[in-house]
């Protein structure tokens, strides 16, 4: 009721107002008046009925509405502005408040609804520019209300009409307010149309969800069309821009939105009051800009937007394809064509009317695409969008564009509206196939045209639209985007004639693109890694790099300021690209300082408080990673970085092959075939020539025309792959010649045309025009000639049609072709020449014309030509790809960044380097440095060493700290470079590797620069021995000072005060607190570097330190100090890492500690001491070796540095460690003893004394308490003591050292368990042997070393201690230990093998060896049970060796020891041992018989014989050193030759004769030894004396007791053993007997000096050997235990005795016979003592010899015994029988 009254009030007031208007009273408006009156009457009647309470139902709505509408329609058709305004205002209100819905059918137009008529009526009120301005505004209001009202629905043509009308008002209206309002209304309308479409799908999705889900869901969050959820761009990005007379900038991230802005819909239901509020403000308020803006603002604030619903978030939507249709319009197709002219009342010459009739372009197959929509709203949106695209494509008029022209304004506003639509595009628009197709077919083609517009506004808008497409639609527009980049953007950047404005706008756009990580990576992945696409990313970076490097602004028609601005933008883009890469790969980055992104890591004075950095950059980017919305229409390729890298490599190969082909086709083909990119078959090559567009068409033509067989085959295959079926001849020829340029040579053309003709006839065999292929061939040739003739500028007289026909007479098998056919060919060629494929020459030519541009005007002309060409190419390409579907990969993998960076790092580096080098602009420098930082980060993350090093070196170079240029040239950019370098070190330390070298070098030089800059003198540099007072006075002093600082490479020679002041000022900033802290932070932050990085860091810090210390006069210790600091900082790292660090640092300390500059070395040693003390405090677990590694530098310094000061300091440092940290030292003991070992051999008494004191303290005291910890170094301790003992300069120390070694034995003895339980590196040592290996062996070994190395008194002491230890502790030794031990002991005798001075060697043998031999025998005897099995043979071998030496004393000792050994232990010998013993003796006997004595001749006398014997002898024994000490041969039976007697003898003779003499001595000694062994202690001398006494007393009783004694080894030896000894004795006797009988030889020897005053003889040997032999035999002969051997014994006795007696008879010399006296006494006495039976056997043999003896003058004793013998013979043979004892005659003294 109320509603009806309100409606009536509106209507009646409006009708009354119309009637009241004086214009209506005119006759022509009678129909209007009547209609108004009828309507008023009806309203009154209706109100009356309602007042009376009539309940009759109202009439049908449509009749009522019809009635009400007619007067308004008539009013709108009237020419009166006031009437029209009133009518429109009422209509607007009725629609706004829902009083008119217009759903009823239109009675006047079948198939239409009333609302369509209403809208048409409103639209028709606009009659062009002359329409009243108030009416225009009312039209706009009414139309906006109609579109936005929730109560009515308008679609298709009607909605297009509303948009068109507003569009026309915008163009035609002269009122600025109306223009602006119309434009704002258009924006709002589009917003509503597209938002409704989006909401409708959302609503359907919600409706579907309701029945499915049982549980109620939380309400779907709605958002306005302007919501960021739908708009992929942030609020701050490009929006629709105002059309104002002023030039506007390209919108970018920082650009403020225009006052129109993006019209956001209001939430909630429409408030109906708003409709009325508009009317109150409808009147124009003035023409000023401000007024216009204000009114627009008011209107827009109150526009009814109730229809706009919030769109749900993207995530809640189903895929567009799956959204179900609604009953309204299941499949709405595009409506049929309508003649628009009948509907358009727009400007006559501006037909921008919107047609709903344009169907989509046919697809590639020529079939029209059915435009299928799931809802009418989608169709509305599609029609509006398509119309706007077509409007934007309309060409501008000729001549320079007029900003006020309808054409230009139309183009601009259409582009602005398109931009608005795209920016607000929702999920449906972005994914529905119809819209994507529309974008491809209409918008992209439109952009290709507008994208090269010379009008800045158009160009700028095109760029903004492209940006939006790239953001939201790149998944669908892969090929279109490629065309944009390749043909437009990059061409504009590369073309030298481009205007600054165009370049600037392109680069602004690129700035936005380059700021989006997803976009940048996607470009690389989809184009550079696609075999069929251009290398967009690479080309983009190269172009930007060239711009960033800057070129001559004059060349490009730019001012220097413009050129700098462009350069900065270029750099900004390059930096953005790298930032994107950094952001993309940030998950791989590990920041040692736990900061999130590179952006945060600034120097302290630059740090950002809110930690934005790259995140901020990301927010400002064109699109986030979410920007790629996949759709059902597109199948994306899976993102596999490795696969893309393979493709990229293949692409590079193909590109290189094409490059080669374009120079030399055969080489290119060969290369591609070798690389497997091209098949070997001619068909493959032909296909390649067809498909590869990058091939040079001229080269392709030359290749195909070549006469070689291979080329012909390729050409045939090439032509055969063309399909000419059902093609006109000229069309076929055009197709054929599109692929290449005909070669210039006639023969080549001939071959090509011939094959073409054959192929054409083959494809068109049914044709009847050509008689044969020859006809086609000739005709083709004639067409080529005709094209040249008609279209070549060189040909002046063009061929006529008649001439052409005449020329082709008779070519068809002697007949003519039809004239009309040839005529049509002529006309076609005349109209359009046969265009052969263009090469790149055209584009290259335009790019290279920059040198030829004479003026700005010429440049603009050239540019316009190029832009036209560009537009033409781009449009053609865009149309070509409009139907193509190329899969787009949305990159997700981090690994893409590595190949991306590898591709572009060089142009990037060039740009940054040149920027830093040539430009002092701080912004340029800042960008370059930021770029380098990002580049270093990427190279670091992906381990690209070459690239990383290149960038870091660039930074180092521009810091001027390492450059050869003068540091006085330092500017702000160089200071910033230093700061950047420090930041890189701080943030990327984990990855820097070898690049640390450059950084640390710079930091070192920075410290040096700071010293100069702050005026510090050389005295502050450690190591300089001089000081200077006062400030710098003049450059001479300054130069000297700097040279003193080692600044030859930093400060150029003549530095005046002014330069110095300037330098100090610039360097002053590097000394600022922030820089100092930042540098320090690198070192303190080293603790956060990872295990590998810290090693690299330390390694290069050490290298820089070495460089600092290399200055001979003024070494610096900055880096060395830092090494010490970082050692402190990093000491708590895990041991594995620390040991790797210390391996480097320790090696450095080794070198520094040996630095020739003592101050440096002292600093190093002291630092080492401090570090060591701290390190030792941490202690060490068992079996670790960290201390050992840590303390090793002390050892090295001690070994290599000969400076007493340093050596003394090292000893004191170690002593301090021992005294304070003994309890914590474990493996470090090794180093400590190694240091003392070095000190032990020093000649400086103080050093030796100090070291020995500490060593003594360790051994005697510390070992007591910490022996288990020192076990591993026990051997080193003993070795160290040994070294002290061997220092001959300090005998007291030596003796004390030996005492301490003896003391060490006590530790081993007392703590065997500790040694047994200790496990370490030698785990292969059995637990039972550890006491030996770790304890006894080192002690005994070192004692043997002392014995071998020291002087007599020390070695004697060492020998004594060694054998004392053996005797004291030997009972604990295992058998195999003894073997090791005796190997050590026998080393004592090895000394003789060394060629030393004869006197020393002699002394050695006489003393030490002697001593050792006896000691060995003592030990062996003491531990015989343990030793005999394992060592007896070794001992015998050693004794044998001694006996064989050319040292009489040693030989005697050897035999003595052998004797002692056997006598002491013989009773324990087993038969086997006796066997070994006897064999040993036999061997000694035989090897020491001096056979050479019998044959030797001096030189010249039978030299050959002599030499032969000598050689034999030398092979068996050592004759290397001859002992000529006469005193040692004093006991020889041979006379000692005087010194004079040897003088004349050659040296070789002397050696030989001395050796022989010793052998004679040994023989005698051996005989005595056997005698002693067998009969000890009954010596032969005693027995001989007793025999003599007995003979004198003439009785045999005297020696009876000897016979009964049972001493010596006789009873322990078997007969066979004794027989062996007898063999020895007999051999010796035989030899000496032979020698003594050889008078001639004895004379030769005597003359040679072998004997002094008398001839040499061997009487003693001759007699003693026989005597011993006889004693043994007679002892055995009477031994009852050997009865079984008596026969052999008797035989031996008889032989020996008879030979002896026979020999005696032959002796002539009296003295010789005298020597035999005791021998004969022995023989006869012993024979007399045997029993009668045995005596008989002997007497019968001896009798004749004894008779012969009677003739000699014998001594009385011998005669007495002989007498007894004969008497006995008489008795035994019973020659006489004594009656009484007295009858035996007394010995005759006279005989």
From Swiss-Prot:
InterPro entries: ARM-type_fold (IPR016024), DCB_dom (IPR032629), Mon2/Sec7/BIG1-like_HDS (IPR015403), Mon2/Sec7/BIG1-like_HUS (IPR032691), Sec7/BIG1-like_C (IPR046455), Sec7_C_sf (IPR023394), Sec7_dom (IPR000904), Sec7_dom_sf (IPR035999). The modification Phosphothreonine is found at residues 244, 623, 633. Expressed in brain (at protein level). The keyword DNA damage does not apply. One of its GO terms (biological process) is regulation of ARF protein signal transduction. Residues 244-257 have a biased composition (Basic and acidic residues). It is found in: Cytoplasm; Membrane; Golgi apparatus; Cytoplasm, Perinuclear region. Residues 2-224 are annotated as: DCB. Residues 208-292, 311-350 are annotated as: Disordered. In vitro phosphorylated by PKA reducing its GEF activity and dephosphorylated by phosphatase PP1. Inhibited by brefeldin A. The keyword Repeat does not apply. Promotes guanine-nucleotide exchange on ARF1 and ARF3 and to a lower extent on ARF5 and ARF6. Promotes the activation of ARF1/ARF5/ARF6 through replacement of GDP with GTP. Involved in the regulation of Golgi vesicular transport. Required for the integrity of the endosomal compartment. Involved in trafficking from the trans-Golgi network (TGN) to endosomes and is required for membrane association of the AP-1 complex and GGA1. Seems to be involved in recycling of the transferrin receptor from recycling endosomes to the plasma membrane. Homodimer. Interacts with ARFGEF1/BIG1; both proteins are probably part of the same or very similar macromolecular complexes. Interacts with PRKAR1A, PRKAR2A, PRKAR1B, PRKAR2B, PPP1CC, PDE3A, TNFRSF1A, MYCBP and EXOC7. Interacts with GABRB1, GABRB2 and GABRB3. This is Brefeldin A-inhibited guanine nucleotide-exchange protein 2. It comes from Rattus norvegicus. The gene is Arfgef2.
């Amino acid at each position: 009721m109320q509603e009806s009254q309100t409606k009536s009030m509106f209507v009646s007031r409006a009708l009354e107002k119309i009637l009241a208007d004086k214009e209506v009273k005119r006759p022509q408006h009678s129909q209007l008046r009547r209609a108004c009156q009828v309507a008023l009457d009806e309203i009154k009647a209706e109100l009356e009925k309602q007042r009376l309470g009539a309940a009759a139902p109202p009439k049908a709505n449509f009749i009522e509405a019809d009635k009400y509408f007619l007067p308004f329609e008539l009013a709108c058709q009237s020419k009166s502005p006031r009437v029209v305004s009133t009518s429109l205002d009422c209509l607007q209100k009725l629609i706004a408040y829902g009083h008119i819905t217009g759903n009823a059918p239109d009675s006047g137009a079948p198939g239409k609804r009333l609302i369509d008529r209403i809208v048409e009526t409103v639209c028709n009120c606009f009659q062009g520019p002359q329409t009243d301005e108030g009416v225009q505004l009312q039209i706009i209001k009414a139309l906006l209300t109609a579109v936005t009202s929730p109560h009515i629905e308008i679609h298709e043509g009607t909605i297009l009409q509303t948009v068109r009308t507003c569009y026309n008002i915008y163009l035609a209206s002269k009122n600025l307010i109306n223009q602006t309002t119309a434009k704002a209304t258009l924006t709002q309308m589009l917003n509503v149309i597209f938002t409704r479409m989006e909401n409708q799908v959302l609503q359907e999705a919600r409706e579907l969800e309701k029945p499915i889900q049982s549980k109620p869901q939380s309400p779907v969050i709605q958002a306005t069309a302007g919501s960021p959820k739908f708009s992929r761009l942030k609020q701050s990005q490009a929006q629709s821009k105002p059309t104002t007379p002023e030039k506007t900038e390209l919108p970018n991230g920082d650009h403020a939105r225009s006052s129109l802005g993006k019209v956001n819909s209001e939430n909630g239901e429409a408030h109906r009051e708003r409709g009325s509020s508009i009317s109150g403000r409808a009147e124009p308020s003035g023409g000023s800009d401000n007024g216009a803006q204000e009114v627009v603002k008011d209107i827009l604030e109150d526009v009814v937007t109730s229809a706009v619903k919030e769109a749900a978030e993207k995530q809640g939507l189903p895929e567009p394809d799956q959204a179900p249709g609604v009953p309204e319009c299941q499949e709405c197709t595009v409506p049929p064509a309508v003649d628009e002219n009948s509907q358009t009342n727009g400007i006559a010459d501006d037909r921008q009317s919107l047609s709903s009739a344009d169907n989509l372009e046919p697809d590639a197959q020529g079939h029209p695409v059915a435009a299928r929509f799931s809802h009418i709203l989608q169709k509305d949106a599609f029609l509006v969008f398509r119309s706007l695209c077509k409007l934007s494509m309309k060409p501008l008029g000729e001549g320079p564009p007029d900003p006020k022209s309808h054409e230009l304004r139309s183009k601009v506003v259409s582009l602005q509206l398109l931009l608005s639509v795209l920016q607000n595009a929702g999920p449906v628009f972005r994914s529905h196939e119809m819209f994507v197709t529309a974008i491809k077919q209409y918008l992209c083609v439109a952009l290709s045209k507008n994208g090269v517009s010379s009008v800045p506004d158009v160009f700028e808008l095109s760029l903004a639209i492209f940006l939006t497409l790239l953001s939201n639609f790149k998944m669908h527009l892969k090929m279109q985007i490629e065309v944009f980049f390749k043909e437009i953007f990059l061409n504009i950047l590369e073309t030298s004639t481009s205007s600054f404005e165009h370049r600037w706008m392109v680069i602004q756009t690129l700035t936005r693109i380059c700021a989006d990580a997803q976009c940048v990576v996607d470009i690389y992945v989809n184009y550079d890694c696609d075999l069929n696409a251009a290398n967009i990313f690479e080309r983009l970076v190269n172009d930007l790099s060239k711009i960033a490097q800057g070129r001559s602004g004059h060349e490009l028609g730019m001012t220097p300021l413009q050129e700098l601005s462009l350069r900065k933008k270029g750099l900004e883009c390059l930096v953005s690209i790298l930032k994107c890469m950094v952001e993309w790969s940030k998950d791989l980055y590990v920041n040692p300082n736990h900061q999130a992104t590179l952006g945060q890591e600034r120097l302290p004075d630059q740090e950002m408080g809110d930690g934005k950095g790259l995140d901020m950059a990301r927010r400002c980017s064109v699109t986030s990673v979410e920007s790629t919305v996949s759709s059902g229409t597109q199948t994306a390729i899976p993102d596999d970085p490795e696969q893309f890298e393979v493709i990229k490599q293949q692409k590079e190969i193909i590109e290189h092959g094409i490059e080669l082909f374009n120079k030399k086709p055969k080489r290119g083909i060969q290369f591609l075939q070798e690389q497997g990119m091209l098949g070997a078959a001619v068909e493959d090559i032909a296909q390649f020539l067809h498909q590869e567009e990058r091939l040079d068409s001229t080269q392709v033509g030359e290749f195909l025309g070549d006469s070689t067989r291979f080329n012909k085959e390729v050409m045939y295959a090439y032509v055969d792959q063309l399909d000419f079926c059902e093609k006109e001849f000229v069309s076929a020829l055009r197709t054929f010649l599109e692929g290449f340029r005909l070669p210039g040579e006639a023969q080549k053309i001939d071959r090509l045309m011939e094959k073409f003709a054959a192929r054409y006839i083959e494809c068109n065999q049914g044709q009847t025009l050509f008689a044969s292929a020859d006809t086609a061939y000739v005709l083709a040739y004639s067409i080529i000639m005709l094209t040249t003739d008609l279209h070549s500028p060189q040909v002046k007289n063009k061929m006529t049609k008649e001439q052409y026909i005449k020329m082709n007479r008779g070519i068809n098998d002697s007949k003519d072709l039809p004239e009309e056919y040839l005529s049509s060919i002529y006309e076609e060629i005349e109209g359009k020449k046969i265009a052969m494929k263009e090469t790149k020459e055209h584009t290259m030519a335009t790019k290279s014309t920059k040198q030829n541009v004479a003026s700005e005007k010429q440049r603009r002309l050239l540019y316009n030509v190029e832009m036209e060409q560009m537009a033409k190419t781009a449009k053609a390409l865009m149309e070509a790809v409009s139907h193509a579907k190329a899969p787009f990969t949305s990159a997700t993998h981090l690994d893409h960044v590595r190949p991306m960076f590898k591709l572009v790092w060089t142009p990037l580096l060039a740009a940054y380097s040149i920027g830093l080098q040539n430009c002092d602009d701080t912004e340029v420098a800042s960008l370059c440095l930021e770029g380098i930082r990002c580049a270093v980060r990427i190279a670091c993350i992906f381990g690209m060493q070459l690239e990383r090093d290149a960038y870091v070196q660039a930074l180092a170079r521009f810091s001027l700290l390492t450059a050869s240029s003068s540091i006085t040239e330092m500017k702000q950019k160089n200071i910033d470079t230093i700061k950047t370098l420090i930041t890189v070190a701080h943030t990327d330390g984990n990855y820097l590797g070898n690049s640390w070298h450059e950084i640390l070098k710079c930091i070192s030089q920075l410290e040096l620069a700071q010293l100069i800059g702050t005026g510090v003198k050389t005295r502050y540099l450690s190591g300089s021995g001089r000081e200077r007072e006062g400030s710098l006075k003049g450059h001479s002093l300054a130069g000297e000072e700097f040279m003193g600082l080692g600044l030859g490479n930093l400060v150029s020679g003549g530095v005046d005060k002014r330069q110095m002041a300037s330098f100090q000022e610039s360097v002053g900033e590097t000394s600022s607190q922030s820089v100092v802290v930042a540098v320090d932070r690198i070192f303190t932050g080293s603790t956060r570097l990872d295990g590998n990085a810290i090693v690299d860091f330390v390694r290069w810090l050490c290298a820089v330190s070495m460089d600092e210390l290399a200055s001979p006069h003024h070494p610096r210790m900055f880096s060395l100090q830092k090494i010490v600091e970082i050692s402190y900082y990093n000491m708590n790292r895990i041991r594995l890492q620390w040991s790797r660090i210390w391996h480097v640092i320790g090696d450095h300390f080794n070198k520094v500690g040996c630095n020739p500059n003592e101050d440096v070395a002292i600093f190093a040693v002291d630092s080492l001491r401090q570090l060591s003390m701290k390190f030792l405090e941490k202690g060490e677990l068992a079996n670790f070796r960290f201390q050992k590694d840590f303390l090793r530098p002390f050892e090295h310094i001690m070994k290599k540095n000969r400076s007493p000061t340093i050596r003394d300091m090292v000893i004191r440092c170690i002593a301090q460690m021992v005294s304070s940290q003994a309890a914590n030292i474990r493996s470090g003991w090794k180093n400590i003893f190694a240091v003392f070992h070095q000190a032990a051999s020093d000649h400086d008494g103080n050093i030796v004394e100090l070291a020995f004191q500490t060593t003594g303290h360790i051994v005697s005291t510390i070992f007591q308490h910490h022996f288990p910890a020192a076990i591993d170094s026990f051997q080193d301790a003993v070795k160290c003591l040994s070294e002290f003992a061997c220092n001959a300069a300090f005998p007291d120390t030596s003796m004390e050292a030996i005492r301490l070694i003896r003391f060490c034995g006590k530790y081993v003895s007392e703590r065997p368990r500790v040694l047994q339980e200790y496990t370490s590196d030698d785990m292969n040592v059995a637990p039972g042997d550890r006491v030996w290996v770790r304890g006894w062996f080192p002690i005994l070994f070192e004692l043997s070393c002392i014995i071998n190395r020291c002087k007599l008194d020390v070695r004697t002491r060492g020998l004594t201690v060694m054998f004392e230890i053996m005797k004291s502790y030997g009972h604990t030794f295992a058998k195999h230990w003894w073997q090791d031990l005796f190997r050590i002991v026998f080393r004592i005798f090895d000394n003789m093998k060394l060629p030393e001075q004869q006197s020393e060697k002699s002394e050695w043998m006489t003393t030490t060896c002697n001593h050792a031999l006896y000691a060995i025998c003592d030990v062996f005897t003491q531990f015989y049970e343990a030793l005999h099995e394992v060592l007896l043979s070794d001992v015998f071998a050693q004794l044998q060796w001694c006996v064989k030496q050319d040292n009489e004393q040693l030989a005697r000792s050897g035999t003595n020891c052998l004797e002692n050994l056997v006598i002491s232990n013989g009773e324990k010998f087993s038969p086997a041992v006796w066997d070994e013993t006897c064999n040993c003796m036999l061997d000694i006997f035989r090897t020491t018989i001096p056979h050479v004595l019998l044959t030797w001749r001096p030189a010249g006398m039978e030299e050959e014989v002599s030499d032969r014997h000598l050689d034999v002898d030398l092979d068996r024994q050592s004759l290397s050193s001859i002992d000529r000490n006469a005193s040692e041969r004093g006991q020889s039976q041979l006379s000692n030759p005087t010194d004079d007697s040897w003088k004349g003898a050659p040296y070789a003779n002397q050696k030989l004769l001395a050796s022989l003499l010793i052998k004679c001595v040994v023989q005698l000694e051996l005989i005595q030894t056997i005698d002693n062994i067998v009969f000890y202690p009954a010596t032969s001398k005693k027995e001989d004396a007793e025999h003599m006494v007995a003979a004198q007393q003439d009785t045999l009783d005297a020696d009876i007791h000897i016979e009964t004694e049972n001493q010596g080894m006789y009873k322990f030896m078997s007969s066979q053993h004794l027989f062996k000894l007898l063999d020895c004795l007999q051999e010796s006797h035989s030899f000496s007997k032979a020698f003594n009988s050889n008078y001639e030889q004895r004379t030769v020897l005597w003359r040679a000096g072998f004997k002094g005053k008398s001839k040499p003889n061997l009487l003693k040997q001759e007699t003693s050997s026989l005597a011993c032999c006889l004693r043994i035999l007679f002892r055995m002969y009477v031994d009852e235990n050997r009865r079984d051997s008596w026969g052999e014994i008797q035989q031996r006795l008889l032989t020996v005795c008879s030979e002896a007696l026979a020999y005696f008879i032959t002796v002539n010399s009296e003295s010789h016979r005298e020597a035999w006296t005791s021998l004969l006494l022995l023989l006869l006495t012993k024979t007399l003592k045997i029993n009668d039976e045995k005596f008989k056997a002997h007497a019968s043999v001896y009798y004749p010899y004894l008779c012969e003896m009677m003739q000699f003058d014998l001594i009385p004793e011998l005669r007495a015994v002989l007498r007894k013998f004969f008497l006995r013979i008489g008795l035994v043979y019973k020659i006489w029988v004594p009656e009484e004892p007295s009858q035996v005659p007394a010995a005759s003294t006279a005989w």
